[in-house]
Design a protein with these regions (language model features):
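Membrane-embedded alpha-helical bundles that constitute the cytochrome b-like, heme-associated redox core
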Residues: 1-222
């Protein structure tokens, strides 16, 4: 059994499963954050933030972190292996057309940009909320953080560019991961591309909308 995960296909499978897990997380994250926009009284968003401080969430955080670490490690392993193999693709796709897109050719670079964005996001929010609470300190007010962070159009633009990088990364990564886990019916190939592309676009457009709305709100435009 262990030999399976030492093989190229096994490594791709691990990276794909961890990637799908992270897609599920960002979907939930975006849906919860939308309450900031569509809750004029801020009661729902405050409830969401309170929920995020529960003990069960503190247990989930290490699992989520492990998902990121596993995905990054196997991305590095596969990228190095692919370069040594002179062009072997990162995912278990079954035809050359699957890796002809710009996103497919730049998955590793896009991944690095996404990683830098995660570091920025953790510094802006997680370090000032969950980490402070974990350290026994008083966490910052989430509304103050939203206003303080997105009041700067430059910071807002950086976040939007980060979301764009995630979009490019996932437009290829999502359906490629589905192929790797076995959903590789050629009849469905084009359909999966459309479905996954639409899904990723909806999620990342939601994130961008939240950031732009927060910027407009912080500057008194809404």
């Amino acid at each position: 059994m262990s030999s399976i995960f030492k093989s190229s296909i096994g490594k791709k499978l691990i990276m794909s499963i961890s990637g799908l897990f992270l897609i599920l997380f960002i979907t939930l994250h975006m849906c919860l954050n939308l309450t900031y926009v569509f809750d004029p009284t801020n009661t729902v968003f405050a409830g969401v933030c309170e929920f995020m401080s529960l003990g069960i969430i503190k247990v989930i955080v290490p699992v989520l972190a492990a998902g990121f670490v596993i995905h990054i490690i196997y991305a590095l392993i596969l990228t190095i292996g692919n370069r040594k193999a002179r062009g072997e693709v990162r995912y278990a796709v079954s035809n050359k057309a699957a890796v002809d897109s710009w996103s497919a050719r730049n998955m590793f670079v896009l991944g690095l940009i996404v990683l830098l964005g995660i570091a920025l996001h953790l510094t802006d929010f997680w370090a000032n909320m969950q980490l402070k609470e974990f350290m026994g300190q008083t966490p910052d007010d989430v509304y103050g953080l939203m206003s303080g962070t997105f009041a700067s159009p430059v910071v807002t633009l950086l976040y939007v560019l980060w979301f764009a990088a995630i979009w490019f990364h996932l437009t290829h990564g999502f359906w490629s991961a589905l192929q790797t886990v076995g959903w590789n019916n050629q009849i469905w190939l084009k359909r999966w591309k459309v479905i996954c592309g639409a899904y990723v676009t909806l999620i990342l457009a939601g994130f961008a909308f939240i950031a732009i709305y927060a910027c407009a709100k912080a500057n008194g435009l809404v």
